[in-house]
């Protein structure tokens, strides 16, 4: 054991070096806290968030961080393809209410950080323009809009009681 897992400066620099290298001008971070999070202690998660924001600002990137709870699952599915499918549902104006709420919260922060006024991401989800914009982004990167997400051969529904 190297005892680096809880070293906030190392965690922050690892995450932020990748984000800054992408060349973005603004960045919104969703730092999770709670029983399902990497940083379960809210105070430590806050410290990580503040450290990453400062690193971003020092590099000339408009950076903000939200510390959000991860004590309960977000959305209705688990697994990469299922979670991507759920995210696409949100872009199409549907999806689970908690995912929609977090999406709008993060998008509003990004719009504000970018200095854009008069735009509400909730409207973009409702009128389909969020999905249209996402499709243009996929096409601009040479992605396949018709790519199929993998489907598991087995399915198990687990209902909370």
Regions found by a protein language model. Name each.
Residues 2-161:
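Well-ordered secondary-structure scaffolds
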């Amino acid at each position: 054991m190297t005892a680096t897992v809880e070293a906030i400066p190392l965690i922050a620099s690892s995450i932020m070096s990748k984000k800054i290298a992408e060349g973005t001008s603004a960045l919104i971070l969703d730092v999770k806290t709670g029983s399902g999070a990497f940083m379960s202690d809210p105070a430590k998660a806050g410290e990580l968030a503040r450290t990453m924001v400062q690193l971003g600002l020092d590099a000339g990137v408009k950076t903000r961080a939200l510390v959000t709870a991860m004590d309960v699952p977000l959305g209705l599915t688990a697994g990469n393809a299922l979670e991507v499918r759920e995210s696409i549902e949100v872009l199409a104006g549907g999806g689970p209410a908690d995912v929609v709420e977090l999406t709008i919260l993060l998008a509003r922060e990004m719009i504000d950080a970018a200095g854009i006024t008069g735009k509400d991401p909730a409207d973009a989800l409702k009128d389909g323009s969020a999905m249209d914009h996402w499709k243009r982004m996929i096409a601009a990167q040479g992605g396949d809009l018709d790519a199929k997400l993998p489907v598991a051969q087995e399915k198990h529904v687990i209902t909370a009681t």
